[in-house]
Amino acid sequence: MPREIITCQVGQCGNQIGMEFWKQLCMEHGINPEGILEDFAVNGEDRKDVFFYQADDEHYVPRAVLIDLEPRVINGIQKSAYSSLYNPENIYIAKHGGGAGNNWGRGYTDAEKVQDEILEMIDREADGSDSLEGFVLTHSIAGGTGSGFGSYLLERLNDHYPKKLIQTYSVFPIENDVVVQPYNCLLSIKRLTLNADCVVVLDNNALTSIAVDRLKILQPTFSQINSIVSTVMAASTTTLRYPGYMNNDMVGLIASLVPTPRCHFLMTGYTPLSLDQKFTSVRKTTVLDVMRRLLQTKNIMVTGAVKKGAYMSILNVIQGDVDPTQVHKSLQRIRERKLANFIPWGPASIQVALSKKSPYIDSGHKVSGLMLANHTGIRSIFKVLYDQYRTFRKRDAYMNIFKQTKIFEDNLDEFDSSDEVVKSLIDEYAAAEKMDYINWGSDDDDMQFDPREPPKFSNIQ
């Protein structure tokens, strides 16, 4: 029985990458833009029901809720070839249509006002599932809607569905993308730390560099960057949709990657990468070649994160016609060459999940791979944003913008709380590099989490 996943797309960025994700899933499952299964895909062995359900006329509908405070992106989706794919009852656009003005406080406050309407959509989707496993949130943490509305939604999902998993695909910003983004990011990272079970970090700087350096695109567009993101998202869910013996549900994936509750921020790598699946610069793909490339810094989608620190866990999702003995030999070669540095207190091994490729897409290569990795160096991206926040906060820069919203009109306690959580997260990732990490925080009575506490998902396996 498939374990269903509901996708919540929040804000401009969240809906843009969500749209690309659904396009990719439709292609991989042989579903046309109107949700109708193509004749050639009728006898497929895939699990479409994880992300889609069938309407009364048997066309496929994404288990998705689309949310934005301004109409432009969702209106574009509704005017596209995929306009009839989505359930129109699951689309929310704010009546005022003015957006959140890149203000986390406005996004959060607006979400609080309409929470009943949003939760009704989500509850309806949940009630239509036979065995709901969890939720996926797509959003950016830099602007107002994805960060503020997304933060509020994370809190409510955690309260409303305490035993369901929450995974996010969170886009981290390019420098100076939004003037108040250090505030928005800090407030969002607190919620991602406390209310999500797994966060896939999508670093816009790294994605842009990959598009320029690897794909040779001089000035990448948002659409091209989002296409890279959708490739990663689709690959990270492939074992759920084309199940094998292992990692065929979300809980299995997350449990293999997240050893302690708060250290659940993942980085990704993908190879071979091409915006046109029929053309790629990699002439020959073997399991060893793919697995070696996944460990190269230039292929990792978080800037500079693996230059220092150590891996806590690695899961490689290998797609294609693969001989398991080649996987074993490749792992042995990587171990001999010490291509991956692991933390001293855990298993120093790369986990591998083998998955089928969609038979409906001619990818032009035999083997492809996605790396999902938990690495202590991820703290570098938090440290940059945290330092920017501290610089702003010392000067009280732009703080009047936030004081105009309900959550900050009386005090700034929420900033202080977020500061504490993010600083602790940075410290914990640094501590995880040392052998005595299992005792980390044991003398601190105020710690909200004990690193030895089992993650939420371990209770529902």
Swiss-Prot record:
Keyword Protease among record annotations: no
A single BP term in Gene Ontology: microtubule nucleation
Binding-site residues, GTP: 142-148
Predominant cellular place of this UniProt entry's protein: cytoplasm
SUPFAM superfamilies xref list: Tubulin C-terminal domain-like, Tubulin nucleotide-binding domain-like
Any GO MF annotation of the entry: GTP binding
Compartments, as annotated in UniProt: Cytoplasm, Cytoskeleton, Microtubule organizing center, Centrosome
InterPro entries: Gamma_tubulin, Tub_FtsZ_C, Tubulin, Tubulin/FtsZ-like_C, Tubulin/FtsZ_2-layer-sand-dom, Tubulin/FtsZ_GTPase_sf, Tubulin_C, Tubulin_CS
Keywords: Cytoplasm, Cytoskeleton, GTP-binding, Microtubule, Nucleotide-binding
Record-level GO cellular component terms: centrosome; cytoplasm; gamma-tubulin complex; microtubule
Organism superkingdom: Eukaryota
Function, as annotated: Tubulin is the major constituent of microtubules. The gamma chain is found at microtubule organizing centers (MTOC) such as the spindle poles or the centrosome, suggesting that it is involved in the minus-end nucleation of microtubule assembly.
PANTHER family with a match to the protein in the record: TUBULIN (PTHR11588)
Protein family membership: Belongs to the tubulin family.
Protein name: Tubulin gamma-2 chain
